[in-house]
């Protein structure tokens, strides 16, 4: 705990030069069927557009609630804070992703950061609304380092709404200290998306790219996948 987390080593190490082939093989190890994988791609690739034509992930604002104090525990499991054995409240979400460049080549060794509110809509930030309701078991911030195939993962909770915003997860991509990308991930089809001022600033294509399709993988946990293109 406390260190950025490498993606778990059970992901396949593929030598194929075809991004489409690698993505299918990788993602089908995370989901129960190829049908689940292609359903997931609906949140990433536009209908009728090949993987080779996907566009860059859109930039979105960092917002005011990037942690004012980075917690001691910054690993990729946000559901457990530090050495606590008690899990945070909320519905668990396994977020898995791939980082590629505009030529569809995987990018390794990059730091992916995420931060979000707890189940009560409270950030780990002194200025957050409702700080007295903060779930101290929720880490609220985490890091994962992309492996040689560009893969990263987080264990967190499904984001919730709070006044003025639809549910979302903040994401930042760093190459050492250089900020390569800042964006936000949304829940596909959430009714508040159409009212959210930041979501509405994106084109339909960008909304698709930044929307997470949630799949229930057992009685208590969900999973989703995303592709970051820089």
Label every model-predicted segment.
Residues 46-50:
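Short, 15-30-residue, compositionally biased linear elements
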Residues 23-45:
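N-terminal secretory signal peptides and thylakoid transit peptides that target proteins
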Residues 3-7, 42, 59:
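Residue-level detector of alpha-helical hydrophobic segments embedded in or interacting with membranes
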Residues 1-28:
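N-terminal amphipathic/basic-hydrophobic helices that include classical n-h-c signal peptides
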Residues 51-213, 217-230:
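Beta-strand-dominated extracellular/periplasmic modules and repeats
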């Amino acid at each position: 705990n406390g260190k950025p987390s490498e993606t778990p080593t059970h992901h396949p190490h593929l030598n194929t030069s075809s991004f489409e082939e690698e993505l299918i093989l990788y993602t089908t190890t995370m989901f129960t069927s190829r049908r689940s994988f292609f359903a997931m791609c609906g949140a990433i690739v536009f209908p009728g557009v090949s993987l080779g034509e996907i566009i860059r992930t859109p930039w979105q604002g960092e917002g005011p609630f990037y942690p004012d104090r980075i917690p001691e525990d910054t690993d990729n499991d946000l559901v457990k804070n530090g050495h606590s054995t008690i899990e945070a409240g909320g519905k668990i979400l396994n977020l898995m992703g791939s980082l590629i460049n505009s030529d569809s080549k995987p990018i390794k060794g990059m730091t992916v950061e995420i931060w979000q509110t707890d189940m009560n809509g409270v950030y780990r930030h002194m200025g957050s609304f409702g700080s007295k309701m903060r779930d101290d078991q929720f880490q609220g911030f985490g890091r994962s380092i992309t492996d040689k195939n560009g893969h990263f993962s987080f264990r967190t909770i499904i984001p919730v709404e709070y006044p003025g915003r639809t549910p979302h997860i903040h994401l930042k991509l760093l190459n050492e200290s250089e900020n390569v990308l800042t964006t936000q991930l949304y829940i596909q089809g959430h009714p508040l998306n159409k009212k959210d001022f930041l979501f509405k600033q994106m084109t339909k294509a960008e909304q698709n790219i930044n929307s997470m399709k949630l799949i229930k993988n057992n009685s208590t946990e969900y999973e989703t996948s995303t592709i970051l293109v820089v």
